[in-house]
Amino acid sequence: MVKTVNILGTEYKVIREPFADKDIDGCCDYTSREIRIRDDNVNEVGDFDELMRKQLRHEIIHAFLAESGLQANYEHYRQFGHDETLVDWFEIQFPKMIKAFESVNAL
């Protein structure tokens, strides 16, 4: 099933599918407006659903950066497109940040 997510006014398709490369769990293609997430637990991860939620957050952050005009404005843009450390940090910390924002009515 293909879902869509609105990223700063642009609709991105979220596609869950098996990947040929077992080392890739997801990708964001801002040129086709597609986010692809692995749907097969080929690596036999313990909590696969949690890993894929984290991966989806990670790819959505890439989409937000791209739609903000930051497709290639980071140190490693030739290899990755965005600084993966920054994207990982937001992906990991965002659930905690949203709770903090909600606790003080900051949304």
What residue ranges belong to the model's regions?
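Active-site recognition of the HExxH zinc-binding catalytic motif
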Residues: 54-66
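Metalloprotease/metallohydrolase-associated module, dominated by Zn2+-dependent proteases
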Residues: 1-51, 67-107
